[in-house]
């Protein structure tokens, strides 16, 4: 007593299990009311935040292109012609906050740069209102060898930045001081 027999209720158990498992795996569970409210609140200002992200990123890219310690800037408008043209065609509201840079000095320069940042948060996530930075070769990709790093598009001197909505002068000042320190690398004792 008390048991429902699937054959008698007409339920397609395999379908129900698959639908539930796939939906939970692919979409996650339903949001809690507080989380849904927080998302709605955040969506109200997303256009303003993205506008500021994009404006700041473009100013940072212009600064980085001229800095002596930066060998390459990776940004939508800095790619070869077909990619830059597509970015200009499809990304009408701006090109986003993600900026990649290659530094002179390899892995030591990358580590020193990250350690010298004062305002940027050193984290692997993206899309925050705060400015974020990571040196993949010494963190998320540190277990890979040179060949695997190259296959994943990461070099020893690559740094990924996500430009936040702070005042752009503060962002550039922090990047400048960290870039200048990156060329010095680690201090070594002299005998």
Question: For the regions a protein language model found, what residue spans apply to each?
Answer:
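Active-site C-terminal subdomain of aminotransferase-like
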Residues: 1-98, 102-130, 137
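PLP-dependent enzyme catalytic core of the Aspartate aminotransferase-like
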Residues: 115-116, 131-191
